């Protein structure tokens, strides 16, 4: 007995390693997966703060206007030939990063960052990145927080108007080359997703349409007084409304798609699937409910959604309760028979499929209606009956 109990005691007191993790079989190498979270980098200053100086404009007139920061009363100059090139240009790949504005919801974008001359870097109180579809602002202001006006300027420059959603930028004074379309697409695709580009090769003019209006506002400020592949100075303005009927139809269709998307987000997913016909069970249920007891009949959408169990208005749901009781007959009938006037029950004439029920016909038959003709009233006689204005005797 002692010889057999000793091995069992040894097995019971044997040390067993404990581990909470998965057991790795022998001969296999345990791989440890390390997830590295890429941190956002801070925005860098685009220019040296020591170089920022507020110099007055050169004197070109006799009177200096402190409100417009311009001289007046001098010789008239060509506003296109007298333009100077921009002092800097934004490089999104290197200059973008987080700032103090990232901690505040609803912050605007930095105008000087778009122009490439912001000296603050990560200490800036505005955003240093490109606008996205999730950056939504009031129509009265642009993405930089500047107030917009009810109408455009005469030269289509400035902030723009809040009366129309303008996503198209006009670019003039482009150096004409054979690859002008490729050059324009390469430089302006940096500021956001481009929907359409139209280039007039012989005139050096281009129209760039962005998918987001905020990107168009950013591109207008970023490319003002810039140059492409040559030393030209671009003239960037807002584009006027396109008179092309196809463009107007395309814009109207885009507005309808935006409205449909907004309605789609506001409604429940199952309701949207039923309306769009993507739910097979909903299609079968719709076909049965909209037949109204008639084989092969399916009511149109306006009839189905106006009258039925799922009608929006309470009047349309009236009559589709589970059971109704007729006041005169005293027997239960289905809701659809009570609503559409099916065959009458009880002692009737036996007419089926009529417009009126048997109880209504019985009430009309029992009613006694007497029609009496009213006597014609005689014409009133008075002192002016025989009076004639043309008579000489009166």
From Swiss-Prot:
A molecular-function term among this protein's GO annotations: U6 snRNA binding
Chief localization: nucleus
One GO cellular component term: U2-type catalytic step 1 spliceosome
Region of interest: Disordered: 1-59, 373-394
Domain of life: Eukaryota
Family: Belongs to the RRM CWC2 family.
The name this protein goes by in its record: Pre-mRNA-splicing factor CWC2
Source species of the chain: Pyricularia oryzae (strain 70-15 / ATCC MYA-4617 / FGSC 8958) (Rice blast fungus)
Gene: CWC2
């Amino acid at each position: 007995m002692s010889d057999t109990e000793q091995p069992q005691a040894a097995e019971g007191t044997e040390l067993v390693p404990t581990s909470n993790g998965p057991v790795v079989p022998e001969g296999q190498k345990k791989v440890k997966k390390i997830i590295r979270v890429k941190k956002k980098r801070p925005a860098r200053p685009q220019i040296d703060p020591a170089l920022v100086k507020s110099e007055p404009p050169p004197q070109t007139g006799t009177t200096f206007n402190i409100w417009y920061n311009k001289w007046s009363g001098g010789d008239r100059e060509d506003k296109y030939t007298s333009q100077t090139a921009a002092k800097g240009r934004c490089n999104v790949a290197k200059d973008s990063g987080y700032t103090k504005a990232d901690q505040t919801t609803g912050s605007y974008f930095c105008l000087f960052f778009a122009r490439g001359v912001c000296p603050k870097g990560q200490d800036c109180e505005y955003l240093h990145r490109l606008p996205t579809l999730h950056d939504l602002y009031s129509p009265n202001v642009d993405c930089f927080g500047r107030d917009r006006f009810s109408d455009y300027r005469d030269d289509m420059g400035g902030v723009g108007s809040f009366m129309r959603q303008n996503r198209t930028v006009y670019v003039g004074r482009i150096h004409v080359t054979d690859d002008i379309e490729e050059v324009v697409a390469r430089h302006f695709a940096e500021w956001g997703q481009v929907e359409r580009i139209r280039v007039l090769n012989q005139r050096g003019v281009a129209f760039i349409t962005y998918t987001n209006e905020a990107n168009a506002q950013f591109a207008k400020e970023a490319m003002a007084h810039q140059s492409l592949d040559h030393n030209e100075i671009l003239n960037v303005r807002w584009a006027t409304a396109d008179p092309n009927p196809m463009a107007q139809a395309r814009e109207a269709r885009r507005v309808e798609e935006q409205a449909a998307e907004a309605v789609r987000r506001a409604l429940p997913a199952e309701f949207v699937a039923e309306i769009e016909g993507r739910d097979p069970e909903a299609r079968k249920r719709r076909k049965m409910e909209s037949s109204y007891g008639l084989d092969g009949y399916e009511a149109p959408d306006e009839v189905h959604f106006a009258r039925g169990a799922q009608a929006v208005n309470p009047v349309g749901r009236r009559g589709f309760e589970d059971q109704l009781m007729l006041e005169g007959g005293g027997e239960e009938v289905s809701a659809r028979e009570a609503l559409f006037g099916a065959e009458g029950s009880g002692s009737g004439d036996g007419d089926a499929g009529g417009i009126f029920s048997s109880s209504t016909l019985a009430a009309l038959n029992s009613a006694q209606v007497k029609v009496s003709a009213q006597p014609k009233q005689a014409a009133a006689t008075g002192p002016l009956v025989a009076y004639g204005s043309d008579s000489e005797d009166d």
